[in-house]
Amino acid sequence: AQKMGSATNISSADIISVPTVSRSISDVTRLSPYGGNGMSFAGADGRTANFTVDGANFNNNFGLSDNLPGGGNPISIDAIEEMQVVISPYDVRQTNFIGGGVNAITKSGTNTFKGSAYVYHRNENMRGNFVAGQEVAGARDKDRNTTYGFTLGGPIVKDKLFFFVNAEYSTIPTVVNRWRGSVDGEANADAYISRTKLEDLQKVSEFVKEKYGYDTGSWTDYPATESNMKFLARIDWNINDNHKLALRYNYTLNQ
């Protein structure tokens, strides 16, 4: 086939061998010589890139950040068979972007039943204490992520009908506000301690509740949990030598 510009093909073996802490698709696209940070290619803003899954667009249409849709991957990296990164191709079938284009192809079932189950976990204690020989001082920000998932694929009718499913769930406990009030009015930025006294914060909270009936709730170091759930199902039907049908359903929920 005639080339329509610079392209990098990324195989399943490449995807498996690339180290990725965040399990992000953008970590894999860096295998392209033009790949930069996030979805940036050849120096262009990441929001000008185009991302497709099996030919369907999955773009950040609102455009306030360079993240993939939903603030993360629309599908699990374990559901991807191969990828291609193209840089401003002149193929008329690939349009509506001026930076790079990422084409992801999802896995499909075969005549052999295959499956996997996995758990990934990371937290702030897995980080080192030194950067370029300098010790990192201060309180360590909470950075935890636990991911559970599975894949399963195989034949429904041998040589004719196949299925593949993938489900993944991630939990990310965070802290909405790390700053705390001080006891003596002395601030300590490294420990996230404000110069505002705890007793003053308590007085303000009590005043607002008595005057307006409004409960301020906690004003210091209170937690929140983010979650991400992905599900993908695909069915492939070999109708005959000239006709094939593929149906794919995917669902993503961020909270």
Please name every model-derived segment.
Residues 94-96, 140-145, 223-227, 239:
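Short sequence motifs at beta-strands and strand-loop junctions characteristic
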Residues 117-123, 165-169, 247-251:
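Transmembrane beta-barrel strands of outer-membrane/channel proteins
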Residues 52, 82, 112-116, 162-164, ...:
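Residue-level detector of the transmembrane beta-barrel scaffold of outer-membrane proteins
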Residues 107-109, 157-159, 240-242:
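Outer-membrane beta-barrel channels and translocator barrels
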Residues 123-138, 142, 206-214:
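Substrate-binding clefts and substrate-entry loops adjacent to catalytic sites
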Residues 1-108, 127, 133-136, 149-151, ...:
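Periplasmic N-terminal accessory/gating domains of Gram-negative outer-membrane beta-barrel systems
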Residues 104, 150-154, 233-237:
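Residues on the lipid-exposed face of transmembrane beta-strands in outer-membrane beta-barrel proteins
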Residues 170-255:
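Outer-membrane beta-barrel domain signature, strongest for Gram-negative TonB-dependent receptors
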